[in-house]
Swiss-Prot record:
Fe(2+) binds at residues 97, 99, 103, 141. It catalyses: 1,2-dihydroxy-5-(methylsulfanyl)pent-1-en-3-one + O2 = 3-(methylsulfanyl)propanoate + CO + formate + 2 H(+); 1,2-dihydroxy-5-(methylsulfanyl)pent-1-en-3-one + O2 = 4-methylsulfanyl-2-oxobutanoate + formate + 2 H(+). Monomer. GO terms for biological process: L-methionine salvage from methylthioadenosine; L-methionine salvage from S-adenosylmethionine. The gene is mtnD. Catalyzes 2 different reactions between oxygen and the acireductone 1,2-dihydroxy-3-keto-5-methylthiopentene (DHK-MTPene) depending upon the metal bound in the active site. Fe-containing acireductone dioxygenase (Fe-ARD) produces formate and 2-keto-4-methylthiobutyrate (KMTB), the alpha-ketoacid precursor of methionine in the methionine recycle pathway. Ni-containing acireductone dioxygenase (Ni-ARD) produces methylthiopropionate, carbon monoxide and formate, and does not lie on the methionine recycle pathway. The record marks 96 as: May play a role in metal incorporation in vivo. One of its GO terms (molecular function) is acireductone dioxygenase (Ni2+-requiring) activity. PANTHER family: ACIREDUCTONE DIOXYGENASE. This is Acireductone dioxygenase. The record marks 105 as: Important to generate the dianion. SUPFAM superfamilies: RmlC-like cupins (SSF51182). It comes from Cronobacter sakazakii.
């Protein structure tokens, strides 16, 4: 189940607000300029789908986003617990960073935790299958896929070069809960 937990950005351990209600999550995030929607990830992809199979199955969703915002490229990120690079990738994504473009993800299976540092708050968004999130360009954030990751998401880009991060050097991510 998707969830949003909001913390103060001073490392406070007590949440300011929490919900698993999709409408409440959307309202909170939209107020911060973050797009959050529940889409339908209802295609049978099998146990370990290829990126090509995922893109073919969800081309209709990609086409909607491209028509709406003019995105130029897309790919699939898929991570499983048996991936030999999981620890290195988790460490990379756990560092606070920004992008020069919106970070758009449509989760078609599994889950991951987007942590958005907006103003004086940290918004932890547990995204699961069916969730579409678009983090605005320039928003400091990090992503936790957990120690035993299992997710597949379609990534949509303005930049044909794909995922390019600008790391902030802030240790803030170390102060907040992570996925197990």
């Amino acid at each position: 189940m998707s969830a949003l937990t909001i913390f103060a950005d001073n490392g406070a351990s007590e949440p300011l607000w929490q919900s698993t209600d999709a409408d409440a999550i959307r309202e909170q995030l939209n107020a911060q300029g973050v797009r959050f929607e529940r889409w339908q990830a209802d295609r049978d992809l099998g146990d370990d789908p290829t990126p090509e199979a995922v893109l073919t199955a969800y081309q209709h969703a990609i086409d909607l986003l491209v028509a709406e915002k003019g995105y130029q490229s897309w790919d699939v990120i898929s991570m499983r617990a048996d991936n030999p690079q999981k620890e290195a990738l988790r460490g990379k994504f756990l560092n606070e960073h920004t992008h020069g473009e919106d970070e758009v993800r449509f989760f078609v299976e599994g889950a991951g935790l987007f942590c958005l540092h907006i103003g004086d708050k940290v918004y932890q968004v547990l995204c699961e299958k069916n969730d579409l999130i678009s983090v605005p360009a320039g928003t400091p954030h990090w992503f936790d896929m957990g120690s035993e990751p299992h997710f597949t998401a379609i990534r949509i880009f303005d930049n044909p070069e794909g995922w390019i991060a600008n790391f902030t050097g802030s240790p803030i991510a170390e102060a907040y809960p992570r996925l197990a």
